[in-house]
From Swiss-Prot:
Keyword terms, alphabetized: Aminoacyl-tRNA synthetase, ATP-binding, Cytoplasm, Ligase, Nucleotide-binding, Protein biosynthesis
Keyword Cytoplasm: yes
Gene name for this UniProt entry: aspS
Any one GO MF annotation of this record: nucleic acid binding
Protein name: Aspartate--tRNA ligase
Binding sites annotated in the UniProt record for L-aspartate: 171, 217, 448, 489
Signal sequence, renumbered to the chain: none
Family: Belongs to the class-II aminoacyl-tRNA synthetase family. Type 1 subfamily.
Function field: Catalyzes the attachment of L-aspartate to tRNA(Asp) in a two-step reaction: L-aspartate is first activated by ATP to form Asp-AMP and then transferred to the acceptor end of tRNA(Asp).
């Protein structure tokens, strides 16, 4: 039906007859002449209708926005005075000779001036996706997946599909369950990840596996989360953690250069302990220059109990953030930051303004200065490298509260004061995570997942001291987003059972949930490691949006609903009866 795409025409096509298919983006009547901007997935071109072409001209008078049309005409150069440098096709136009109105459009339910709510855009997603901004994001997504497949194929990886209907296993979030009609009362689970299947593929000898795969998690949603999302899933045999990181870093560096034209350089590697201490986050945004600085040793003997008590407590922390130029903040602004850290459990936000660094105690302004002597002030100013015009913000309390509160404050200050370099890329690897963390009920839970191997520990040593275990795990972080994470896996039966026991999974439950895995580990399992990238997050970063729904063709809302199809919906009674399911309505009090 067509010879060319609208957005691909240029001066090299001058004089050629072309047939185009697409939509009316805009129509203009100018002094008896009709111009339209015609749009397809590749872009927009101007089409000119001359009254001398009577049939086409009379039809063009009927055109309205979003009519689906086909035109045949000749490409010609625009006069110099009419060249539009803001359009990729701005040097040419198409002189229309025939017009076919394929389909008419009713007035759009979306406003072309972009004043639509997100709910409207999701309800009429098929119209919203016609916008070049949205279409370009999905085209970039396609380029990214195409690049990943080429890279992985060239590295000798095999693209192998794993099941969508599988067994529920504890991976940190709720499962989406699918009832079985054949096996009454039993349910499949949609996979939260292909984790166990890709490990089984390594046990099967496939050595290098990858898959671009849908995953499902029934969890509370945020701007960067969806109930169904896409992973670039990778697993290898006989490779160390360092080798996996090296290969995956190479892929991401080449991807960024391909899509954005940027060389990310080599990624720094930091431990979990270091990033939590310096940045208050396990996914730090390194574009932000602010850091947390520990000062407990400097204030442990002061007569200010807010500092002295946590400074002398092994579970306490006193830390400070130096904000360049922050002395200009008003008391009202400082009070607002105090309320902000309260969200994270902080009981207040002490501060010191540095007016004259060389004057020491006499050169600072602070409600707490009266509790601190000249030696302490000098120590604080020296350790933080404070300069005239800076402000110091303090956190004091438990390690968790101080780390969380100052970590969040660091990000907020970076945005509010334009300290974060938004036009740059700052990737890193985070390694050496704790293997377990407190579950809040006196037990332990796996920080990553229960199939992660510890670093340099036997099963007996792990069982004896699980709290000190370091996981052989690694996360890739770019600009404050965790874009990928992985680990070296457990490949010995006794180690896997030891981990299960630490997590409170008894022998019977181990067999019920993971019997197939424990059996497989008995038959010559190779050492293996892997990683998974969040494709949606990668696309989000590379297209410059902060909302993951912008890079998914048909996303769900934060309530996990599809406004377009009205999913989820009620099942008809006959289907429920066939599945032996009865729906029990919740009482209002519940």
């Amino acid at each position: 039906m067509r010879t060319d795409y609208c957005g691909q025409l240029n001066l090299t096509h001058e004089g050629q007859k072309v047939t185009l298919c697409g939509w009316v983006n805009r129509r203009r009547d100018l002094g008896g002449l009709i111009f339209i901007d015609m749009r397809d997935r590749e872009g927009i071109v101007q089409v000119f209708f001359d009254p001398d072409q009577q049939a086409a001209f009379s039809q063009a008078a009927e055109l309205r926005n979003e009519f689906c049309i086909q035109i045949t005409g000749t490409v010609r150069a625009r006069p110099d005075s009419q060249i539009n440098k803001d359009m990729a096709t701005g040097e040419i136009e198409v002189f229309a000779e025939s017009l076919n109105i394929i389909n008419r459009s009713e007035p759009l339910p979306l406003d072309s001036n972009q004043t639509n709510s997100e709910e409207q855009r999701l309800k009429y997603r098929y119209i919203d996706l016609r916008r070049p901004e949205m279409a370009n994001r999905l085209k970039t997504r396609a380029k990214i997946t195409s690049f990943v497949r080429r890279f992985m194929d060239n590295q000798g990886f095999l693209d192998i599909e794993t099941p969508m209907l599988t067994k529920a296993t504890p991976e940190g979030a709720r499962d989406y369950l699918v009832p079985s009609r054949v096996h009454k009362g039993k349910f499949y689970a949609l996979p939260q990840s292909p984790q166990l299947f890709k490990q089984l593929l390594m046990m099967s000898g496939f050595d290098r596996y990858y898959q671009i795969v849908k995953c499902f998690r029934d969890e509370d949603l945020r701007a960067d989360r969806q109930p169904e999302f896409t992973q670039i899933d990778v697993e290898t045999s006989f490779m160390t953690a360092e080798q996996v990181r090296e290969m995956m870093e190479k892929m991401i560096r080449e991807l960024w250069f391909e899509i954005d034209g940027v060389d990310l350089g080599h990624f720094p590697v930091m431990t979990f302990a270091e990033v939590m201490r310096r940045f208050g986050s396990d996914k730090p945004d390194l574009r932000n220059p602010l850091e947390l600085v520990d000062v407990a040793d400097l204030v442990k003997d002061v007569e200010f109990s807010v500092f002295a008590e946590p400074a002398n407590d092994s579970k306490g922390r006193v830390a400070v953030i130096r904000v360049p130029g922050g002395a200009e903040l008003s008391r009202k602004q400082i009070d607002e930051y105090g309320k902000f850290v309260g969200i994270y459990g902080a009981k207040g936000l002490a501060w010191i303004k540095v007016n004259a660094r060389a004057a020491g105690l006499e050169g600072v302004q602070s409600p707490i200065a009266k509790f601190l002597n000249a030696e302490v002030i000098e120590g604080l100013l020296s350790r933080t490298d404070a300069q005239d015009g800076d402000i110091l913000f303090f956190g004091a309390g438990s390690v968790k509260v101080v780390t969380d509160a100052l970590g969040a404050l660091r990000l907020k200050l970076g945005r509010d004061l334009n300290l974060t370099k938004l036009d740059s890329w700052r990737p890193l690897w985070v390694i050496d995570f704790p293997m377990f963390e407190d579950d809040g009920e006196g037990g332990l839970t796996a920080m990553h997942h229960p199939f992660t191997s510890p670093c340099n520990m036997s099963a007996a040593e792990l069982a004896q001291d699980p709290v000190s275990a370091i996981a052989n795990a690694y996360d890739m972080v770019i600009n404050g987003y965790e874009v990928g994470g992985g680990s070296v896996r457990i490949h010995r039966n006794e180690m896997q059972q030891a981990v299960f026991r630490i997590l409170g999974i008894n022998e019977q439950e181990q067999q019920e949930k993971f019997g197939f895995l424990l059996d497989a580990l008995k038959f010559g399992t190779p050492p293996h490691a892997g990683l998974a990238f969040g494709l949606d997050r990668l696309v989000m970063l590379l297209t410059g949006t902060d909302n993951i729904r912008d890079v998914i063709a048909f996303p769900k809302t934060t309530a996990a609903a599809c406004l377009m199809t009205e999913a989820p919906s009620y099942a008809n009674p006959a289907s429920l009866e066939e599945l032996s399911i009865s729906v029990v309505a919740k009482k209002e009090s519940e």
